[in-house]
A protein has these predicted regions:
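A generic structural signal for tightly packed, nonpolar segments enriched in small/aliphatic residues
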Residues: 1-149
Length: 149
């Protein structure tokens, strides 16, 4: 909910682009593992994130936000439910992205980067990753800012 509020507040400033991140769901780890972040949002923003991540060694993969998953998130008492109980264990990352999308203003290019897996490295050092917090997606954000400047 707090991330949704932050997205809505950021949209009050009418940004051209909105990129944000969190360790949103364990579903990201199930779908993409511990090295590849999941990215959800508008198609152009997702492709920008994917391209920037590739250039700086922080791979990200665009994920769909299917309408049928959104339909299962209807609520009798709220604008949207955080989960789709019809999916059982599947699609958790997609549900998270769909939930966040509800807070994005129309016309804003937006991408959420789910770094539940890549945020923390427990294996042997590789590339610029040592054990512990990786800093993903800071390099991606810096590349995005550079590309947009």
């Amino acid at each position: 909910m707090i991330l949704g509020d932050a997205i809505a507040r950021a949209c009050d400033d009418n940004p051209d682009f909105l990129f944000e991140t969190s360790t949103l769901t364990g579903g990201q780890v199930v779908a993409l593992g511990k090295r590849v972040a999941g990215v959800m949002g508008t198609p152009d923003a997702c492709e920008r994130v994917k391209a920037a991540g590739e250039r700086v060694g922080e791979p990200a993969w665009p994920m769909p936000l299917p309408d049928d998953v959104r339909k299962g998130m209807e609520s009798e008492i709220a604008d949207i439910c955080q989960t789709n109980s019809n999916l059982d264990r599947g699609g958790h990352m997609l549900q998270g992205g769909i939930f966040l999308r509800e807070f994005v203003a129309d016309g804003v290019e937006w991408a959420h980067i789910d770094v539940a897996g890549p945020a923390y490295h427990t294996g042997e050092p590789t590339g610029y990753w040592t054990k512990g917090g990786t800093g993903v997606p800071v390099r991606t954000f810096l590349k995005l800012i550079d590309d947009l400047a």
